[in-house]
């Protein structure tokens, strides 16, 4: 097997629904692609259910078709922009931990085959702390935890970080505050989370910024597009471009953790 081109693998997650995680995944992916990065967004939530609403796309095939040998991973990719594609993972993710050795090998080959066509893999996980979420997050190189200004958001984010740290030794997390009314509000949310993690866990948290509450985001969703395209000069669009700039500066780790082949191996391993 050829050595895989190093790919930055980022899992976007949050301890609960309603934090705008899918919107973050999609807009971050679009912003990175606008910078010239080749991005694959893996929808690991409910197939294209959420991403479909945001991008107006329809998937003919899913990862399950690749596992059954009906098509290649490249044939499953749905192009969303010039340098952005989506992997509709829908039904395939349900059986990720029950793959045969042959399917396991096929999946690694499949991702290895498309490694050369991408620089970044963004994984939009489901809400909560299900086995599927844990699998995707612990396999990724970077974990971006999205929080918003609701009391349960911080509590649920802490529960997710605690589980990943205690059971899977994930010890480094990036935190993004979404739908904030000021950057200070975002920093305050991060401080609350940092206070409890510093007290009870051995983890490193890094604040990566905030996305402002912006009516343009809701209007873009109604138009089945992203705020970066519908309202490119909006406050939210500007914030997403700043976030993409920061993410682009994150190093691709030299260790195998986060490389595609390793990502898939971790994904299909029984915990």
Question: How would you name each of these model-derived features?
Answer:
Residues 113-116, 130-152:
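Inter-motif core of Ras-like GTPase G domains
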Residues 201-228, 239-242:
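Beta-strand-loop-alpha "switch" segments that mediate conformational coupling across diverse proteins
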Residues 42-116, 221-226:
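P-loop/Walker-type NTP enzyme "switch/lid" segment
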Residues 46-48, 91-94, 128, 150-152, ...:
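Conserved nucleotide-binding/hydrolysis micro-motifs of P-loop NTPases
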Residues 154-169:
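Conserved C-terminal guanine-recognition region of P-loop GTPase G domains, centered on the G4
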Residues 15, 148, 173-187, 210-217, ...:
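G-domain G4 guanine-recognition motif of GTPases
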Residues 9-73, 120-123:
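Walker A/P-loop NTP-binding active-site region of P-loop NTPases
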Residues 227-271:
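NTP-binding/hydrolysis catalytic cores, primarily Walker-type P-loop NTPases
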């Amino acid at each position: 097997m050829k050595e895989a081109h190093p790919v930055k693998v980022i899992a976007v997650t949050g301890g609960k629904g309603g934090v705008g995680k899918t919107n973050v995944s999609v807009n971050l992916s679009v912003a990175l692609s606008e910078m010239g990065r080749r991005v694959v967004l893996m929808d690991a939530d409910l197939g294209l259910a959420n991403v479909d609403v945001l991008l107006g796309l329809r998937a003919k095939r899913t990862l399950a078709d690749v596992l059954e040998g009906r098509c290649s991973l490249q044939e499953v990719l749905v192009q969303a922009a010039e340098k952005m594609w989506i992997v509709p993972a829908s039904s395939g993710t349900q059986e990720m931990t029950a793959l045969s050795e042959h399917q396991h090998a096929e999946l690694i080959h499949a991702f290895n085959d498309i490694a050369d066509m991408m620089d970044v893999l963004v994984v939009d996980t489901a809400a909560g702390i299900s086995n599927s979420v844990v699998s995707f997050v612990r396999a990724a190189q970077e974990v971006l935890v999205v929080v918003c200004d609701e009391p349960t958001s911080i509590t649920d984010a802490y529960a997710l970080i605690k589980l990943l740290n205690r059971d899977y030794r994930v010890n480094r997390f990036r935190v993004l505050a979404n739908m904030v009314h000021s950057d200070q509000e975002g920093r305050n949310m991060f401080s609350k989370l940092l206070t409890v993690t510093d007290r009870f866990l051995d983890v490193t948290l890094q604040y990566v910024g905030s996305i402002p509450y912006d009516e343009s985001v809701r209007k873009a969703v109604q138009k089945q597009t992203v705020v970066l395209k519908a309202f490119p000069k909006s406050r939210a669009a500007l914030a997403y471009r700043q976030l993409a700039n920061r993410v682009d500066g994150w190093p691709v780790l030299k260790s195998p953790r986060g490389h595609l082949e390793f990502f898939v191996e971790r994904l299909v391993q029984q915990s």
